[in-house]
Amino acid sequence: MKKKEYDVIIIGAGPAGIFTALELTKKNNVSVLILEKGEEIKKRECLMRSKNGGCFHCSPCAIISGWGGAGAFSDGKLNLSTEIGGQLDNYIDKDKVAELIKYADDIYLEFGADKNVYGTDKEEIDIIKKEASLAKLKLIPTRIRHLGTEKCTEILEKMQDYLKTKIDIKTNTKVKEILVENRKAVGIETVKGEIIKGKYVVAMPGRAGSEWLKEQAEKMDIKIANNPVDVGVRVEVPAIAMKRLTDAVYESKLVYYTQKFDDRVRTFCMCPYGEVVTEFNDGIASVNGHSYQEHRTDNTNFAVLVSTNFTEPFKEPIAYGKYIAHLANILSGGVIVQRLGDLELGRRSTPDRLTHSIVTPTLKEATPGDLSFVLPYRILSGILEMLKAMDKIAPGVYSKHTLLYGVEVKFYSSRLELSCCLETKVSNLFAAGDGAGITRGLIQASTSGIIVADEILRRRNRKK
């Protein structure tokens, strides 16, 4: 790092931060610094994978922190729809969101994204949509560009190499505090006490930094609203059971409202021919899924998440989600895996019982156990209702052999009060991406970064 003062300081090198920087570099006279608490993309390594052991509890977790953010090692799905992956249409016109999503997608293509797009077979999708409706499921059609984990990291590396020639990037640097004077952002202080001044500060810490951002917002008296808490399991089935759906739309976005509690349940992050993985955040192990273009398994995995909207006086949805994940850690030392058949019989899965399953677990480190000791009844019953409904359009999903991994929790629960240009009530302090609670995926997070950058450039041009 060459200087102590910048035009723009970006906190977080996930898609929101990266695309903010990419847009800002279109003007040669803007000095930009990206600060990232994790490693650069080439050095991000999960020891659990490289050493074939259990989770090493690295801090920060290489799976969710570092250049590229939590999505760097995902299977890289770009949902090219305004209805999926965020709430940007709450801030700007939906047509404008669609235009910016197309713009962001074009940038991914420039850096090497695959040109193939799923979800274009309208006739087949309409048939599936009708069948889903009869099963009391809502299929949300969306066009998806699938990068694959290998291609996703390759694209992120190209973006990093490009930006290194344009801006300053500092990895392994955790921000302690956003500095404010007279209700105006003026810079940041790192955990090592280094103070860096900036005319604009952009907070994009991702899911891993959502709690930190909430704490900062509270200090600055920025209003916070709670998003629903999403808690559930990662489901693993034979790939053939989901093949019809994944061939047509790649990722089936299905929504269901439970009969018993009227809770919203949804599928999330479907990974055809993928593998289940552990991710680690703030001392807690949870579960996720990846899929690769080159390396395929015989299974498909996806999350089933139950959304809960808490009301007054409860204000700690993130703590609630972490508490449930921590219960699984206490019982198993990490992630629990259970056959659906064992859950129905009211018994735990054992290593021996898992050998009777036709589904071979892809997360070898998961401990056979009993999820009914972890998940609240309301959440567990919602998951089972959802799987029964899905079985009507994908026979084989609700099978005694189906594997359930727990738990999966999404930590994007606090939504900051933002203007239409994603600025907080603190002047020149912007927030965007998953960490700010306004996006939930790669493409809308990327788009949110473009919105912020365009506003900063507009203000700079106005001052000239």
Write out the residue ranges for each language-model feature:
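Dinucleotide-binding Rossmann-like beta1-alpha1 core, especially the glycine-rich loop
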Residues: 66-118
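Residues forming the flavin
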Residues: 2-85, 123-464
